[in-house]
Amino acid sequence: MSSNCTSTTAVAVAPLSASKTKTKKKHFVCQKVKLFRASEPILSVLMWGVNHTINELSNVPVPVMLMPDDFKAYSKIKVDNHLFNKENLPSRFKFKEYCPMVFRNLRERFGIDDQDYQNSVTRSAPINSDSQGRCGTRFLTTYDRRFVIKTVSSEDVAEMHNILKKYHQFIVECHGNTLLPQFLGMYRLTVDGVETYMVVTRNVFSHRLTVHRKYDLKGSTVAREASDKEKAKDLPTFKDNDFLNEGQKLRVGEESKKNFLEKLKRDVEFLAQLKIMDYSLLVGIHDVDRAEQEETEVEDRAEEEECENDGVGGGLLCSYGTPPDSPGNLLSFPRFFGPGEFDPSVDVYAMKSHESAPKKEVYFMAIIDILTPYDAKKKAAHAAKTVKHGAGAEISTVNPEQYSKRFNEFMSNILT
């Protein structure tokens, strides 16, 4: 089962030292007739399928309340001898959306307009991420970096069905104010007889603010260091021991710490009730001063390049990059933010460092990987690790109640 795969379900804007395109002009070709052009057939089918299902849903009235059958429902379409747009789409494919009414309701509760969601997934091809789970889990972001698309296993799909009703009820009760993953859609794509399952969530990290350092924290210290291979990446995912050895702290202030831990405790208690464990707190850190310095350097280079190309007359325009065309209502009216500023309705997991902190930072924090039930396989792994490391060791495969308690305690200690 895929439950042994730990992975990062957020994709950051890479540090500018690695990718110097933040303020360069980006050109996204947006045709009136969508061509769903992507680098591989599976992504073209995803774009086509989401476009199709959202269009179909727009003709279905929003019910007063969801019914039990909505949590078992699906819509599927089989396309044969597809001649239109054959240079981009395979001639035969199948697309299935799970629980369409439920996920539409969840998108609404998370403040995501269906038109915005459709545009983000279909306007330009999703982007591959270098984040990858140990079992080959694949991550992509939508072109505007608002949503993460993750491949999952059929077991994960089954587990989603198991928890979806209670998850939805929890989201209703907390009014969408949660650190849990925001599940927005779940699909099965069949191309050349191969089935691929995908789940779409809101990106934990910002589409705009660069993440300079990130951590996957479980509250366990056994075998919880980033590998040398991981550390060689432009933006490695560090782990618990790396965090502790660096003496890292998240300096948010007393009030923000109290509010965050209350929300975390409520979310984690819910996961323990569902017998779910092995989740992580994903943490991204945006260094405001470093970002300003990188921005200035890139703007200077861009200005020099553009002024060389355009002549002296273009000088005033050279200082400003052009953001990509943006989906529907969320970004119809551009808003200009100062350094380290963000829109809390978009960057819902963001939190500023306290005014007294030695460095001005923005933290992005959310719970990820919640589709791991405490089943027989986990119990066996726990027994094996206990034999190897001893009963007192902080291993990650404890039971859900122990896991949640240890998780809360660890997170309480790293916030200040």
UniProtKB/Swiss-Prot annotation:
Its EC number is 2.7.1.149. Gene3D superfamilies: 2-Layer Sandwich, Phosphatidylinositol Phosphate Kinase II Beta. One of its GO terms (molecular function) is 1-phosphatidylinositol-5-phosphate 4-kinase activity. InterPro entries: PInositol-4-P-4/5-kinase_C_sf (IPR027483), PInositol-4-P-4/5-kinase_core (IPR002498), PInositol-4-P-5-kinase_N (IPR027484), PInositol-4/5-P-5/4-kinase (IPR023610). Keywords: Acetylation, ATP-binding, Cell membrane, Cytoplasm, Endoplasmic reticulum, GTP-binding, Kinase, Lipid metabolism, Membrane, Nucleotide-binding, Nucleus, Phosphoprotein, Transferase, Ubl conjugation. Residues 38-415 form the PIPK domain. Its main location: endoplasmic reticulum. It comes from the Eukaryota. The keyword Aminoacyl-tRNA synthetase does not apply. The gene is Pip4k2b. The modification N6-acetyllysine is found at residues 94, 150. Pfam families: PIP5K. Residues 64-70 are annotated as: Required for interaction with PIP5K1A. The modification N-acetylserine is found at residue 2. ATP binds at residues 202-204, 214. The modification Phosphothreonine is found at residues 8, 322. This is Phosphatidylinositol 5-phosphate 4-kinase type-2 beta. GTP binds at residues 203-204, 214, 369. It is a peripheral membrane protein. GO terms for biological process: 1-phosphatidyl-1D-myo-inositol 4,5-bisphosphate biosynthetic process; autophagosome-lysosome fusion; negative regulation of insulin receptor signaling pathway; phosphatidylinositol metabolic process; phosphatidylinositol phosphate biosynthetic process; positive regulation of autophagosome assembly; regulation of autophagy. Participates in the biosynthesis of phosphatidylinositol 4,5-bisphosphate. Preferentially utilizes GTP, rather than ATP, for PI(5)P phosphorylation and its activity reflects changes in direct proportion to the physiological GTP concentration. Its GTP-sensing activity is critical for metabolic adaptation. PIP4Ks negatively regulate insulin signaling through a catalytic-independent mechanism. They interact with PIP5Ks and suppress PIP5K-mediated PtdIns(4,5)P2 synthesis and insulin-dependent conversion to PtdIns(3,4,5)P3. GO terms for cellular component: autophagosome; endoplasmic reticulum membrane; nucleus; plasma membrane. Ubiquitinated by the SPOP/CUL3 complex. Ubiquitination is stimulated by PtdIns5P levels. Phosphorylated on serine residues. Homodimer. Binds TNFRSF1A. Interacts with PIP4K2A; the interaction suppresses ubiquitination by the SPOP/CUL3 complex. Probably interacts with PIP5K1A; the interaction inhibits PIP5K1A kinase activity. It comes from Rattus norvegicus. It is found in: Endoplasmic reticulum membrane; Cell membrane; Nucleus; Cytoplasm. It catalyses: a 1,2-diacyl-sn-glycero-3-phospho-(1D-myo-inositol-5-phosphate) + ATP = a 1,2-diacyl-sn-glycero-3-phospho-(1D-myo-inositol-4,5-bisphosphate) + ADP + H(+); 1,2-dihexadecanoyl-sn-glycero-3-phospho-(1D-myo-inositol-5-phosphate) + ATP = 1,2-dihexadecanoyl-sn-glycero-3-phospho-(1D-myo-inositol-4,5-bisphosphate) + ADP + H(+); 1,2-dihexadecanoyl-sn-glycero-3-phospho-(1D-myo-inositol-5-phosphate) + GTP = 1,2-dihexadecanoyl-sn-glycero-3-phospho-(1D-myo-inositol-4,5-bisphosphate) + GDP + H(+).
